[in-house]
Amino acid sequence: MIHSLFLINCSGDIFLEKHWKSVVSQSVCDYFFEAQEKAADVENVPPVISTPHHYLISIYRDKLFFVSVIQTEVPPLFVIEFLHRVADTFQDYFGECSEAAIKDNVVIVYELLEEMLDNGFPLATESNILKELIKPPTILRSGVNSITGSSNVGDTLPTGQLSNIPWRRAGVKYTNNEAYFDVVEEIDAIIDKSGSTVFAEIQGVIDACIKLSGMPDLSLSFMNPRLLDDVSFHPCIRFKRWESERVLSFIPPDGNFRLISYRVSSQNLVAIPVYVKHSISFKENSSCGRFDITIGPKQNMGKTIEGITVTVHMPKVVLNMNLTPTQGSYTFDPVTKVLTWDVGKITPQKLPSLKGLVNLQSGAPKPEENPSLNIQFKIQQLAISGLKVNRLDMYGEKYKPFKGVKYVTKAGKFQVRT
Protein backbone atom coordinates (compact mmCIF):
# COMPACT_ATOMS: atom_id res chain seq x y z
CA MET A 1 0.00 0.00 0.00
CA ILE A 2 2.40 2.74 1.24
CA HIS A 3 5.68 2.53 -0.63
CA SER A 4 7.55 5.47 0.89
CA LEU A 5 7.22 8.24 3.46
CA PHE A 6 8.92 11.65 3.26
CA LEU A 7 9.05 14.17 6.10
CA ILE A 8 9.34 17.76 4.86
CA ASN A 9 9.80 20.93 6.91
CA CYS A 10 8.33 24.37 6.15
CA SER A 11 11.48 25.36 4.24
CA GLY A 12 10.87 22.56 1.75
CA ASP A 13 13.75 20.36 2.95
CA ILE A 14 13.26 16.57 3.02
CA PHE A 15 14.94 15.70 6.32
CA LEU A 16 13.79 12.06 6.63
CA GLU A 17 12.62 9.35 4.25
CA LYS A 18 11.61 5.74 4.72
CA HIS A 19 10.98 3.12 2.01
CA TRP A 20 9.15 -0.17 2.61
CA LYS A 21 9.29 -1.65 -0.88
CA SER A 22 11.37 -0.29 -3.75
CA VAL A 23 13.19 3.01 -3.25
CA VAL A 24 11.26 5.96 -4.66
CA SER A 25 13.34 8.95 -5.75
CA GLN A 26 12.98 12.23 -3.87
CA SER A 27 12.11 13.85 -7.20
CA VAL A 28 8.54 12.55 -6.78
CA CYS A 29 8.12 15.30 -4.15
CA ASP A 30 8.49 17.94 -6.89
CA TYR A 31 4.77 17.46 -7.61
CA PHE A 32 4.08 18.22 -3.95
CA PHE A 33 6.28 21.34 -4.01
CA GLU A 34 4.43 22.60 -7.10
CA ALA A 35 1.09 22.22 -5.32
CA GLN A 36 2.56 23.92 -2.24
CA GLU A 37 3.60 26.97 -4.29
CA LYS A 38 0.10 27.30 -5.75
CA ALA A 39 -1.61 27.06 -2.36
CA ALA A 40 -2.49 30.33 -0.61
CA ASP A 41 -1.68 28.80 2.77
CA VAL A 42 0.20 25.72 4.00
CA GLU A 43 -3.06 24.19 5.20
CA ASN A 44 -4.54 24.51 1.71
CA VAL A 45 -2.14 22.08 0.01
CA PRO A 46 -4.30 19.32 -1.57
CA PRO A 47 -4.10 16.19 0.64
CA VAL A 48 -4.20 13.93 -2.44
CA ILE A 49 -2.03 14.67 -5.48
CA SER A 50 -2.12 12.47 -8.57
CA THR A 51 1.12 12.04 -10.57
CA PRO A 52 1.77 9.95 -13.71
CA HIS A 53 2.99 6.92 -11.72
CA HIS A 54 2.12 7.62 -8.05
CA TYR A 55 -0.37 9.18 -5.68
CA LEU A 56 0.95 11.55 -3.00
CA ILE A 57 -1.19 11.61 0.16
CA SER A 58 -0.10 14.07 2.85
CA ILE A 59 -0.99 15.71 6.14
CA TYR A 60 0.33 18.89 7.81
CA ARG A 61 1.13 18.57 11.52
CA ASP A 62 3.20 20.79 13.80
CA LYS A 63 4.85 22.68 10.90
CA LEU A 64 5.80 19.41 9.20
CA PHE A 65 4.45 17.67 6.11
CA PHE A 66 4.09 13.88 6.19
CA VAL A 67 4.01 12.85 2.51
CA SER A 68 3.29 9.21 1.64
CA VAL A 69 3.83 7.70 -1.81
CA ILE A 70 1.22 5.22 -3.09
CA GLN A 71 1.40 3.28 -6.37
CA THR A 72 -2.13 1.81 -6.42
CA GLU A 73 -5.51 3.30 -5.60
CA VAL A 74 -6.40 3.08 -1.90
CA PRO A 75 -8.98 4.89 0.28
CA PRO A 76 -7.22 8.24 0.97
CA LEU A 77 -8.75 8.62 4.45
CA PHE A 78 -7.21 5.28 5.44
CA VAL A 79 -3.73 6.60 4.62
CA ILE A 80 -4.43 10.02 6.18
CA GLU A 81 -5.55 8.38 9.43
CA PHE A 82 -2.37 6.27 9.48
CA LEU A 83 -0.19 9.36 8.96
CA HIS A 84 -1.94 11.04 11.89
CA ARG A 85 -1.21 7.91 13.98
CA VAL A 86 2.47 8.26 13.05
CA ALA A 87 2.51 11.91 14.14
CA ASP A 88 0.64 11.06 17.37
CA THR A 89 3.17 8.31 18.12
CA PHE A 90 6.09 10.71 17.69
CA GLN A 91 4.31 13.17 20.00
CA ASP A 92 3.78 10.43 22.59
CA TYR A 93 7.37 9.16 22.45
CA PHE A 94 9.32 12.42 22.22
CA GLY A 95 6.99 14.94 23.87
CA GLU A 96 6.71 16.89 20.62
CA CYS A 97 6.42 16.14 16.92
CA SER A 98 9.09 18.52 15.63
CA GLU A 99 12.01 18.34 13.24
CA ALA A 100 14.50 18.67 16.11
CA ALA A 101 12.88 15.88 18.16
CA ILE A 102 12.76 13.53 15.16
CA LYS A 103 16.42 14.19 14.26
CA ASP A 104 17.52 13.68 17.88
CA ASN A 105 15.76 10.29 17.97
CA VAL A 106 16.21 9.21 14.37
CA VAL A 107 17.07 5.58 15.25
CA ILE A 108 13.88 5.17 17.30
CA VAL A 109 11.89 6.86 14.50
CA TYR A 110 13.06 4.25 11.98
CA GLU A 111 12.38 1.43 14.47
CA LEU A 112 8.85 2.74 15.03
CA LEU A 113 8.13 3.07 11.31
CA GLU A 114 9.40 -0.48 10.77
CA GLU A 115 6.98 -1.82 13.38
CA MET A 116 3.99 0.35 12.45
CA LEU A 117 4.06 -0.68 8.78
CA ASP A 118 4.72 -4.21 7.54
CA ASN A 119 5.59 -4.32 3.83
CA GLY A 120 3.56 -1.15 3.35
CA PHE A 121 0.49 -2.21 5.36
CA PRO A 122 -0.37 -0.90 8.89
CA LEU A 123 0.47 -3.46 11.56
CA ALA A 124 0.86 -1.98 15.06
CA THR A 125 -0.40 1.54 15.72
CA GLU A 126 -1.46 1.28 19.37
CA SER A 127 0.87 3.18 21.68
CA ASN A 128 0.82 0.52 24.43
CA ILE A 129 1.94 -2.21 22.02
CA LEU A 130 4.65 -0.03 20.48
CA LYS A 131 6.05 0.88 23.90
CA GLU A 132 6.52 -2.82 24.67
CA LEU A 133 8.18 -3.38 21.31
CA ILE A 134 10.34 -0.24 21.40
CA LYS A 135 11.12 1.42 24.72
CA PRO A 136 10.58 5.21 24.82
CA PRO A 137 13.82 7.21 25.01
CA THR A 138 15.22 8.31 28.37
CA ILE A 139 18.51 10.01 29.20
CA LEU A 140 19.77 6.89 31.03
CA ARG A 141 18.68 4.50 28.26
CA SER A 142 20.24 6.70 25.58
CA GLY A 143 23.53 6.77 27.49
CA VAL A 144 23.60 3.00 27.99
CA ASN A 145 22.74 2.38 24.32
CA SER A 146 25.54 4.66 23.12
CA ILE A 147 28.07 2.75 25.26
CA THR A 148 26.86 -0.80 24.68
CA GLY A 149 25.62 -0.37 21.11
CA SER A 150 22.25 -1.90 21.99
CA SER A 151 18.90 -0.62 20.72
CA ASN A 152 15.54 0.22 22.26
CA VAL A 153 13.85 -2.79 20.65
CA GLY A 154 12.29 -5.11 23.26
CA ASP A 155 13.16 -8.81 23.38
CA THR A 156 9.68 -10.13 24.24
CA LEU A 157 6.39 -10.23 22.33
CA PRO A 158 3.91 -7.60 23.58
CA THR A 159 1.30 -9.10 25.89
CA GLY A 160 -1.53 -7.22 24.19
CA GLN A 161 -0.55 -8.10 20.62
CA LEU A 162 -2.43 -11.41 20.60
CA SER A 163 -5.28 -10.50 22.99
CA ASN A 164 -8.74 -9.22 22.14
CA ILE A 165 -7.88 -5.87 23.78
CA PRO A 166 -4.61 -4.98 22.05
CA TRP A 167 -4.72 -1.35 23.24
CA ARG A 168 -3.95 -2.32 26.86
CA ARG A 169 -0.95 -4.21 28.15
CA ALA A 170 -1.23 -6.71 31.00
CA GLY A 171 0.20 -6.29 34.49
CA VAL A 172 -0.28 -2.53 34.84
CA LYS A 173 0.31 -1.34 38.42
CA TYR A 174 0.09 2.13 40.00
CA THR A 175 0.51 3.37 43.56
CA ASN A 176 -2.04 6.14 42.93
CA ASN A 177 -4.93 5.09 40.70
CA GLU A 178 -6.53 7.99 38.84
CA ALA A 179 -8.78 8.71 35.87
CA TYR A 180 -9.04 12.23 34.47
CA PHE A 181 -11.04 13.50 31.50
CA ASP A 182 -10.71 16.76 29.55
CA VAL A 183 -13.78 17.92 27.61
CA VAL A 184 -12.39 20.38 25.05
CA GLU A 185 -14.74 22.18 22.66
CA GLU A 186 -13.95 24.53 19.78
CA ILE A 187 -16.64 26.81 18.43
CA ASP A 188 -16.59 27.76 14.75
CA ALA A 189 -18.87 30.65 13.85
CA ILE A 190 -19.56 33.35 11.28
CA ILE A 191 -21.39 36.46 12.56
CA ASP A 192 -22.77 38.97 10.05
CA LYS A 193 -22.77 42.80 10.26
CA SER A 194 -25.99 42.93 12.27
CA GLY A 195 -24.76 40.42 14.84
CA SER A 196 -26.87 37.52 13.56
CA THR A 197 -25.34 34.05 13.38
CA VAL A 198 -24.76 32.92 9.79
CA PHE A 199 -23.07 29.66 10.75
CA ALA A 200 -22.18 28.01 14.05
CA GLU A 201 -20.81 24.60 14.90
CA ILE A 202 -19.01 23.01 17.82
CA GLN A 203 -16.18 20.51 17.41
CA GLY A 204 -15.44 18.65 20.63
CA VAL A 205 -13.13 15.98 21.99
CA ILE A 206 -12.83 14.09 25.25
CA ASP A 207 -9.21 13.34 26.09
CA ALA A 208 -8.47 10.87 28.87
CA CYS A 209 -5.53 10.30 31.18
CA ILE A 210 -6.00 6.86 32.73
CA LYS A 211 -3.55 5.46 35.27
CA LEU A 212 -5.35 2.46 36.74
CA SER A 213 -3.95 -0.85 37.93
CA GLY A 214 -5.08 -4.20 36.58
CA MET A 215 -7.82 -4.49 33.95
CA PRO A 216 -10.55 -1.96 34.91
CA ASP A 217 -13.84 -1.78 33.02
CA LEU A 218 -15.18 1.79 32.95
CA SER A 219 -18.60 3.30 32.18
CA LEU A 220 -18.85 7.04 31.52
CA SER A 221 -22.35 8.54 31.39
CA PHE A 222 -23.51 12.06 30.45
CA MET A 223 -26.35 14.32 31.55
CA ASN A 224 -27.37 15.09 27.93
CA PRO A 225 -25.70 12.72 25.44
CA ARG A 226 -28.34 13.17 22.71
CA LEU A 227 -26.89 16.50 21.56
CA LEU A 228 -23.77 14.80 20.15
CA ASP A 229 -23.54 14.30 16.36
CA ASP A 230 -20.99 12.48 14.21
CA VAL A 231 -19.26 10.81 17.15
CA SER A 232 -15.90 9.17 16.42
CA PHE A 233 -14.81 6.55 18.97
CA HIS A 234 -11.57 5.05 20.20
CA PRO A 235 -11.53 1.30 19.34
CA CYS A 236 -11.86 0.43 23.04
CA ILE A 237 -15.46 1.69 23.23
CA ARG A 238 -18.33 -0.82 23.00
CA PHE A 239 -20.41 0.66 20.21
CA LYS A 240 -23.59 -1.37 20.88
CA ARG A 241 -23.78 -0.06 24.45
CA TRP A 242 -23.50 3.50 23.14
CA GLU A 243 -26.24 2.93 20.55
CA SER A 244 -28.67 1.47 23.06
CA GLU A 245 -27.94 3.45 26.25
CA ARG A 246 -25.77 6.42 25.17
CA VAL A 247 -23.13 5.30 27.72
CA LEU A 248 -19.41 4.99 27.00
CA SER A 249 -18.37 1.52 28.19
CA PHE A 250 -14.72 0.55 27.70
CA ILE A 251 -11.55 -1.07 28.99
CA PRO A 252 -9.18 1.89 28.68
CA PRO A 253 -5.67 2.03 27.25
CA ASP A 254 -2.96 2.90 29.75
CA GLY A 255 -1.97 6.57 29.77
CA ASN A 256 -3.16 9.43 27.57
CA PHE A 257 -5.54 8.87 24.66
CA ARG A 258 -8.49 10.45 22.84
CA LEU A 259 -11.70 8.76 23.94
CA ILE A 260 -14.13 10.36 21.47
CA SER A 261 -14.46 13.30 19.12
CA TYR A 262 -17.85 14.75 18.26
CA ARG A 263 -19.75 17.59 16.62
CA VAL A 264 -22.74 19.71 17.63
CA SER A 265 -24.23 21.14 14.44
CA SER A 266 -27.70 22.32 15.49
CA GLN A 267 -27.37 26.11 15.51
CA ASN A 268 -30.05 26.51 18.17
CA LEU A 269 -27.78 24.52 20.53
CA VAL A 270 -24.69 26.66 19.83
CA ALA A 271 -24.41 29.61 22.22
CA ILE A 272 -22.23 32.47 20.97
CA PRO A 273 -20.25 33.62 24.05
CA VAL A 274 -19.01 37.04 22.80
CA TYR A 275 -20.38 39.96 20.82
CA VAL A 276 -18.57 42.72 18.93
CA LYS A 277 -19.77 46.26 18.25
CA HIS A 278 -17.91 47.64 15.27
CA SER A 279 -17.74 50.78 13.18
CA ILE A 280 -15.12 50.71 10.42
CA SER A 281 -15.45 53.38 7.74
CA PHE A 282 -13.35 54.65 4.84
CA LYS A 283 -14.22 57.93 3.11
CA GLU A 284 -14.13 58.38 -0.66
CA ASN A 285 -11.12 60.43 -1.89
CA SER A 286 -9.78 60.73 1.65
CA SER A 287 -6.49 59.66 3.21
CA CYS A 288 -8.01 58.57 6.52
CA GLY A 289 -10.70 56.37 7.98
CA ARG A 290 -12.26 55.49 11.34
CA PHE A 291 -11.81 52.25 13.29
CA ASP A 292 -13.86 51.47 16.39
CA ILE A 293 -14.55 48.04 17.91
CA THR A 294 -15.82 46.98 21.33
CA ILE A 295 -15.97 43.38 22.56
CA GLY A 296 -17.97 41.94 25.44
CA PRO A 297 -19.56 38.77 26.86
CA LYS A 298 -22.87 37.97 25.19
CA GLN A 299 -24.47 36.27 28.15
CA ASN A 300 -23.71 35.82 31.81
CA MET A 301 -22.41 32.26 31.95
CA GLY A 302 -20.72 32.71 35.30
CA LYS A 303 -17.35 32.04 33.67
CA THR A 304 -14.59 34.45 32.67
CA ILE A 305 -13.70 34.76 29.00
CA GLU A 306 -9.91 35.01 28.78
CA GLY A 307 -7.05 34.92 26.29
CA ILE A 308 -8.97 37.12 23.84
CA THR A 309 -7.11 38.12 20.68
CA VAL A 310 -8.63 40.01 17.75
CA THR A 311 -6.87 39.74 14.37
CA VAL A 312 -7.87 41.93 11.42
CA HIS A 313 -6.46 41.72 7.88
CA MET A 314 -6.74 45.36 6.79
CA PRO A 315 -7.06 46.44 3.12
CA LYS A 316 -3.84 46.96 1.12
CA VAL A 317 -4.40 50.74 0.91
CA VAL A 318 -3.90 51.08 4.69
CA LEU A 319 -0.51 52.62 5.52
CA ASN A 320 -0.71 52.83 9.30
CA MET A 321 -3.13 52.91 12.22
CA ASN A 322 -3.20 55.26 15.22
CA LEU A 323 -5.41 53.54 17.76
CA THR A 324 -6.07 53.72 21.50
CA PRO A 325 -7.01 50.55 23.42
CA THR A 326 -8.85 50.80 26.74
CA GLN A 327 -7.43 47.38 27.62
CA GLY A 328 -4.52 45.28 26.40
CA SER A 329 -2.15 46.24 23.60
CA TYR A 330 -2.19 46.21 19.81
CA THR A 331 0.32 45.86 16.97
CA PHE A 332 -0.03 46.67 13.28
CA ASP A 333 2.32 45.25 10.67
CA PRO A 334 2.48 47.73 7.74
CA VAL A 335 3.92 45.02 5.47
CA THR A 336 1.31 42.27 5.95
CA LYS A 337 -1.43 44.80 6.92
CA VAL A 338 -2.39 42.65 9.91
CA LEU A 339 -3.74 44.28 13.07
CA THR A 340 -3.50 42.19 16.26
CA TRP A 341 -5.22 43.31 19.46
CA ASP A 342 -4.27 41.29 22.55
CA VAL A 343 -7.18 41.95 24.91
CA GLY A 344 -6.72 39.41 27.72
CA LYS A 345 -9.70 38.88 30.06
CA ILE A 346 -13.15 40.46 29.74
CA THR A 347 -14.97 41.88 32.76
CA PRO A 348 -18.64 42.85 32.20
CA GLN A 349 -18.17 46.02 34.27
CA LYS A 350 -15.65 47.49 31.80
CA LEU A 351 -15.86 46.44 28.17
CA PRO A 352 -12.58 46.75 26.23
CA SER A 353 -12.55 48.88 23.09
CA LEU A 354 -10.06 49.85 20.39
CA LYS A 355 -10.63 53.04 18.43
CA GLY A 356 -8.74 55.60 16.38
CA LEU A 357 -7.72 56.70 12.89
CA VAL A 358 -6.64 54.70 9.85
CA ASN A 359 -4.11 56.27 7.48
CA LEU A 360 -4.67 55.42 3.80
CA GLN A 361 -2.64 55.89 0.64
CA SER A 362 -3.44 59.31 -0.84
CA GLY A 363 -5.43 59.10 -4.05
CA ALA A 364 -6.14 55.40 -3.62
CA PRO A 365 -9.73 54.24 -4.23
CA LYS A 366 -11.93 53.44 -1.26
CA PRO A 367 -11.72 49.74 -0.22
CA GLU A 368 -14.56 47.74 -1.74
CA GLU A 369 -15.44 45.98 1.52
CA ASN A 370 -14.66 46.20 5.20
CA PRO A 371 -12.31 43.64 6.77
CA SER A 372 -13.51 40.72 8.90
CA LEU A 373 -12.51 40.23 12.53
CA ASN A 374 -11.01 36.89 13.57
CA ILE A 375 -11.38 36.28 17.30
CA GLN A 376 -9.63 33.85 19.61
CA PHE A 377 -10.69 33.21 23.22
CA LYS A 378 -10.80 30.58 25.94
CA ILE A 379 -13.33 29.80 28.68
CA GLN A 380 -12.23 27.52 31.52
CA GLN A 381 -14.59 25.04 33.21
CA LEU A 382 -17.31 25.38 30.57
CA ALA A 383 -18.42 23.20 27.67
CA ILE A 384 -20.28 25.64 25.45
CA SER A 385 -22.54 22.88 24.10
CA GLY A 386 -23.85 22.18 27.59
CA LEU A 387 -22.36 18.67 27.67
CA LYS A 388 -21.80 17.45 31.23
CA VAL A 389 -20.36 14.22 32.59
CA ASN A 390 -22.80 12.56 34.96
CA ARG A 391 -20.68 9.83 36.55
CA LEU A 392 -17.83 7.39 36.05
CA ASP A 393 -18.28 3.82 37.28
CA MET A 394 -15.54 1.19 37.47
CA TYR A 395 -15.97 -2.59 37.43
CA GLY A 396 -13.50 -5.47 37.64
CA GLU A 397 -11.23 -3.91 40.30
CA LYS A 398 -11.86 -3.29 44.00
CA TYR A 399 -9.85 -0.11 44.67
CA LYS A 400 -11.36 3.42 44.51
CA PRO A 401 -9.61 5.65 41.97
CA PHE A 402 -9.26 9.44 41.98
CA LYS A 403 -11.61 10.90 39.35
CA GLY A 404 -11.84 14.31 37.74
CA VAL A 405 -13.31 16.17 34.75
CA LYS A 406 -12.12 19.47 33.28
CA TYR A 407 -14.04 21.54 30.71
CA VAL A 408 -12.50 24.02 28.25
CA THR A 409 -14.11 26.03 25.44
CA LYS A 410 -11.93 27.65 22.78
CA ALA A 411 -12.58 29.64 19.63
CA GLY A 412 -11.87 27.76 16.43
CA LYS A 413 -12.54 29.71 13.24
CA PHE A 414 -14.57 32.52 14.78
CA GLN A 415 -15.23 35.36 12.34
CA VAL A 416 -17.21 38.59 12.65
CA ARG A 417 -18.04 40.38 9.40
CA THR A 418 -18.07 44.18 9.37
UniProtKB/Swiss-Prot annotation:
Subcellular location: Golgi apparatus; Cytoplasmic vesicle membrane
Subunit structure: Adaptor protein complex 3 (AP-3) is a heterotetramer composed of two large adaptins (delta-type subunit AP3D1 and beta-type subunit AP3B1 or AP3B2), a medium adaptin (mu-type subunit AP3M1 or AP3M2) and a small adaptin (sigma-type subunit APS1 or AP3S2). Interacts with AGAP1. AP-3 associates with the BLOC-1 complex.
GO cellular component entries: axon cytoplasm; clathrin adaptor complex; cytoplasmic vesicle; cytoplasmic vesicle membrane; Golgi apparatus
SUPFAM superfamilies hit by this protein: Second domain of Mu2 adaptin subunit (ap50) of ap2 adaptor, SNARE-like
InterPro entries recorded: Adaptor_comp_med_subunit, AP2_Mu_C_sf, AP_mu_sigma_su, Clathrin_mu, Clathrin_mu_CS, Longin-like_dom_sf, MHD
One of the GO BP terms on file: anterograde synaptic vesicle transport
Gene (name only): AP3M1
Primary location recorded for the protein, binned into one broad class: Golgi
Positions of the MHD domain: 176-417
Pfam family of the protein (one): Clat_adaptor_s
Membrane association type: Peripheral membrane protein
Keywords from the UniProt entry: Cytoplasmic vesicle, Golgi apparatus, Membrane, Protein transport, Transport
CDD domains from the UniProt entry: AP-3_Mu3A_Cterm, AP3_Mu_N
Its biological purpose: Part of the AP-3 complex, an adaptor-related complex which is not clathrin-associated. The complex is associated with the Golgi region as well as more peripheral structures. It facilitates the budding of vesicles from the Golgi membrane and may be directly involved in trafficking to lysosomes. In concert with the BLOC-1 complex, AP-3 is required to target cargos into vesicles assembled at cell bodies for delivery into neurites and nerve terminals.
Protein name in UniProt: AP-3 complex subunit mu-1
Homology family: Belongs to the adaptor complexes medium subunit family.
